Every structure is written in C-alpha cells, then in structure tokens.
C-alpha cells in the first residue's frame, strides 16, 4: 500500500463521519443502487472502501429519477473499472434506515462482468469471491444482501 493510500483512509473516514452528522440533522430520503456483480466464472466482486469497514457490494447513491440499473452500472464503472457485462436485472428493493437516512436500496444482479481495476479515491481494494467461500470481514449489511440475492439466483 502506498503512502498516499495510507493517508487517504483516515481523511475519507473523517469526511464520511461529517456526512453522517449532516444526515443526523436532516434525516434525508435517499436512493441507492448496489451491484451483485458476477464474473463469467460466477465469482462475486466485492470492494473495500476507504471510508467504511468491511467488504461491500459495489454501489452508491443515485437520484430519484435515475434508473437503478443504470446507476449500478455507473457505480461499477467508477469503482471497479467495468468494461462489459451480460444480463442485468433488479433482484429486489429494500427500505431501510442507514446512518440516519431513509434509504431505498435497489439490489441489482449484473452477470458476466469484465473489468479492469484502476486506482480510485473511494475504493481501496477489489476482490473476487466464491459464493460458497465468502471472505472474512463482510460488512453486516453486505452479508444480509448476499443472503437475500443468493436466494433469488
């Protein structure tokens, strides 16, 4: 890990904490799109973010008018360097309260994902994991989402 990477983690974490303080005051309604991205070998792509702990599905926020499938693809381009993909479909939508936000999380299955990792301000590391042998350190919400989506494959 480079010096820049080492310094970025606490800066990004502090920025995320400030965002959460703002959400505590405002209690916004938000929309998220999260990709259950499978490689051609059926490996699940997970990311480790600089500002949050645990392995997570690639994803992020989107506007109310943006199609969640398009938002998931945008997030895959930004976070893992998406090059191409196969079938894409909505697995489910979940209403949840996260960090003082009322969030509608769209879980999107994206198959046959090909990507070329590149450096990112947001993503510290990318891995591929077998659905039968998920890595230690999954974020709790990620574990829950994987269980929900796996039942729909």
Model-found features: residue ranges?
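Acidic, metal-coordinating catalytic segment for phosphate/diphosphate chemistry
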Residues: 1-34
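Active-site-adjacent beta-strand/loop module that shapes the phosphate/pyrophosphate-binding cleft
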Residues: 93-117, 125-127, 131, 145, ...
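Conserved hydrophobic "DFG−1" position in protein kinase catalytic cores
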Residues: 37-38, 46, 110, 128
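Short strand-loop junctions, especially beta-strand C-caps/beta-turns
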Residues: 60, 131-132
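A short coil-to-beta-strand element that immediately follows conserved catalytic motifs
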Residues: 83-93
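Conserved Nudix-box catalytic region and its N-terminal flanking loop in Nudix hydrolases
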Residues: 39-78
């Amino acid at each position: 890990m480079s010096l820049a990477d080492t310094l970025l983690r606490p800066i990004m974490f502090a920025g995320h904490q400030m965002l959460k303080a703002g959400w505590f005051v405002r209690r916004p309604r938000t929309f998220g799109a999260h990709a259950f991205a499978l490689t051609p070998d059926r490996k699940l792509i997970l990311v480790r973010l600089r500002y949050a702990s645990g392995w997570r599905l690639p994803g992020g926020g989107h506007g109310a008018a943006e199609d969640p499938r398009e938002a998931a693809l945008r997030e895959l381009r930004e976070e893992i360097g998406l090059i191409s993909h196969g079938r894409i479909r909505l697995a489910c939508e979940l209403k949840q309260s996260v960090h003082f936000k009322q969030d509608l999380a769209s879980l999107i299955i994206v198959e046959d994902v090909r990507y070329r990792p590149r450096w990112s301000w947001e993503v510290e590391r990318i891995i591929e994991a077998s659905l039968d042998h998920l890595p230690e350190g999954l974020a709790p919400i990620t574990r829950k989402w994987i269980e929900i989506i796996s039942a729909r494959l």
